[in-house]
């Protein structure tokens, strides 16, 4: 049998050099590492990795070729109280594997044991890693590098976006290929989108609990192999990576960036009763935050938390991010529960992973977006990320909903959120674009559901409606659920228009949830993470073309307003913004704090947003000048000059002079 040569300790993973494959694996506490390769008949052949450089185990297999299927068995102490859970009876996934063959199905053999090890061998049912070689031709691909100030983000799910699209060929709907189809690209261009933000596409698994209920993890926030592309979104799993890159190349040619939602905060191994896939069996003590009793710190709500302050884990995470940029040409990342990235264990702006990203010539040049919290004490870190990061601005989300749907927000607070939440983000040289403004996102109500439901309806998730937030700041306008009288439908439509206008004409970087622009509903489910069905798939046949046109007109209007595009903080007297009351006069202190919900926002001295968020029709006296209502609030060539606007209840309008 062929013997392994010592090989090299870098790079991590399995790499083919034309003559054979070099294998490397980090483990600081292992006593022995076996490489397990599987032939075409599934027969396993084991080799001890002979090289041991510091904490890196390595070996070189001559004559090995791309397509080779492999895994690891790692020997070491079983000492749960110390955080060590080595069990060589369990085949392990290479954390740096580029491709995975097989499905992660619930099986008792995937468990390593709790207090005592489970010595039943599981190689027969564990998916295998696959050695790959890359010869992809990027041709003349170049990243669009859209300035932050010009960026419009569209958050979407690979499958849900196109699975029901009638104009995309049936055989590619719901796949990476569909993202790059001309129909999809033309739609995004016409809408005005500059960046497509995709929910996780790295290899993930469905939790055993969901599988037992006949459900699956639809969103993908349960990663197994962070370097491997999720094959279920490919027309052919063997060509998944090329299909994904073809889509990125097509999007880039259209000037659209691609941002990946990436999960570095936890793994699919869940808590100690969860499955053993990889990290727990390779070096549990190094990869995870471990409590004094040997259990996990659960700062993510998912059972475990990756220790992104450990040097080896920082190297692993950094290499993963570089891989997606260098191999797939992605333009940036949205980091799930990103406060974990800064834990040491307390949150620090100079945490090791932040420093590594800052110092990396590759990662420091792409768009970085944080979901700036986790569930641990001190986990709410909105506004506290390093200057390279933009952040999801939940202050904006809650303020917009409260202002238009709950009617309980002072004008001063609303204006602060409209002005990129400068009280939160104007620090450390950050620009207004650091505020990622959103009204909705994948988690929570859709925009339509915000105006149709007062309460969540998550019974289909199998948790008796306990899951999902109760703080929705929604308003059903008098009837719970979809449908209703013409008056009800119109009032809901007006609220949607108001929320979209607030989102798309505010300072900061707007993020639109896919489907909100044509009225998608999840029927009140505000936590549809396990609903891979028509609840989450966008139904293009039922799309509201009127709402889509309204949204596109707002985005194109935004691009005409210098105050929103220049990405500079607004200062008193700089001509970017003036805040006026219903009589076109500056607001008094009392009006800011206690005044009626009527406001005029004059942008760049030419564009006026007139707001009447009261229950009554109100006359709004416009500032001096010849004002015309403009799209989407009037036709392209509206000749009507307006001096006084009869503002409908809960209404707004945009004028130009």
Swiss-Prot record:
Pfam families: Alpha-amylase, CBM_48, GlgX_C. The active site is at 336 (nucleophile), 371 (proton donor). GO terms for biological process: glycogen catabolic process. Pathway: Glycan degradation; glycogen degradation. The keyword Hydrolase applies. It is an enzyme of class 3 (hydrolase). GO terms for molecular function: glycogen debranching enzyme activity; hydrolase activity, hydrolyzing O-glycosyl compounds. The record marks 443 as: Transition state stabilizer. It catalyses: Hydrolysis of (1->6)-alpha-D-glucosidic linkages to branches with degrees of polymerization of three or four glucose residues in limit dextrin. Residues 460-479 are annotated as: Disordered. Its EC number is 3.2.1.196. It comes from the Bacteria. Keywords: Carbohydrate metabolism, Glycogen metabolism, Glycosidase, Hydrolase. Removes maltotriose and maltotetraose chains that are attached by 1,6-alpha-linkage to the limit dextrin main chain, generating a debranched limit dextrin. Belongs to the glycosyl hydrolase 13 family. PANTHER family: GLYCOGEN DEBRANCHING ENZYME. This is Glycogen debranching enzyme. The lineage of its organism: Bacteria, Pseudomonadati, Pseudomonadota, Gammaproteobacteria, Enterobacterales.
